[in-house]
């Protein structure tokens, strides 16, 4: 639970950040700086505390809509929009840091990148990534949105785009909104089918990755471990 502890320092959050560095500030202090001002009833620190206590975790705050933010006393439309913009900007910075654009270097790196990109998806998405001979990304395409058992019916559309792009390599990935990374029987059957289909047309099937809850499962890594 968040609480506003008595500040042993004579400095306000902005001054503390300037002289001590941002890593020394609490979540409440950092949010107070982003809010800039408080209200007649609350200081920026108290308002920041009210927000964090309301949503309980940073992850809940990250998912909060403009209307949900406006439910808090002192948070109007303008501040709600500013908070949403701040969250989205942070997301884009994090995406840049997590991912080397243009090339797949390993199942781990790409799996973690996809786990971040797909973490807010409430439905299952099947995504195909098409690569050239240097593992550079030619195209990343969402093939299907919905239940996996429907998405796994046929690899035909995946291979259609692979051939169209003159792809040398292929990765496929889908998310489990539940966060459970254990592959289902349908996942295993699909992996076998798409791998065989790639072999038939001379495309290197690199991996099938399952993502959820910020992590990933790699069929390729699992096979290597056996």
Curated annotation (Swiss-Prot):
Q: Show the SUPFAM superfamilies listed in the entry.
A: RuvA domain 2-like
Q: Which InterPro entries match?
A: MPN (IPR037518), RadC_JAB (IPR025657), RuvA_2-like (IPR010994), UPF0758 (IPR001405), UPF0758_CS (IPR020891), UPF0758_N (IPR046778)
Say if the entry is tagged with keyword Oxidoreductase: no
Q: Which GO terms describe its biological process?
A: proteolysis
Specify which residues bind Zn(2+) according to the UniProt entry for this protein.
174, 176, 187
Can you tell which superkingdom this protein's organism belongs to?
Bacteria
> Which is an annotated Pfam family here?
UPF0758_N
Q: Which keywords are on file for this protein?
A: Hydrolase, Metal-binding, Metalloprotease, Protease, Zinc
The answer to keyword Isomerase applying to this record is no
Q: Where is this motif: JAMM motif?
A: 174-187
Q: Name one GO molecular function term.
A: metallopeptidase activity
What residues does the MPN domain cover?
103-225
Do you know which NCBIfam families this protein is assigned to?
A: PRK00024.1, radc
For this chain, the family text in UniProt reads: Belongs to the UPF0758 family.
Its protein name is UPF0758 protein LL1007
């Amino acid at each position: 639970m968040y609480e506003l502890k008595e500040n042993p320092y004579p400095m306000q959050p902005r001054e503390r950040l300037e002289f001590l560095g941002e890593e020394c500030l609490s979540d409440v202090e950092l949010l107070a700086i982003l809010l800039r001002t408080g209200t007649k009833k609350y200081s920026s620190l108290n308002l920041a505390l009210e927000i964090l206590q309301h949503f309980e975790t940073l992850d809940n705050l990250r998912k909060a809509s403009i209307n949900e933010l406006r439910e808090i006393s002192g948070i109007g439309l303008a501040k709600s929009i500013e908070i949403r913009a701040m969250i989205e900007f942070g997301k884009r910075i994090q995406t840049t840091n997590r991912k080397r654009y243009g090339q797949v270097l390993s199942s781990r790196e790409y799996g973690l990148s996809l786990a971040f990109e797909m973490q807010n998806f409430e439905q299952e998405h099947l995504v195909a990534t098409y690569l050239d001979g240097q593992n550079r990304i030619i195209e990343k395409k969402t093939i299907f949105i919905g239940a996996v058992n429907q998405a796994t019916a046929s690899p035909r559309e995946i291979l259609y785009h692979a051939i169209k792009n003159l792809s040398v390599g292929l990765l496929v990935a889908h998310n489990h909104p539940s966060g459970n990374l254990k592959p289902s029987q349908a996942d295993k059957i699909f992996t076998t089918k798409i791998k065989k289909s790639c072999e038939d047309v001379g495309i290197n099937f690199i991996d099938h990755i399952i993502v959820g809850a910020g992590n990933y499962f790699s069929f390729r890594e699992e096979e290597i471990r056996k």
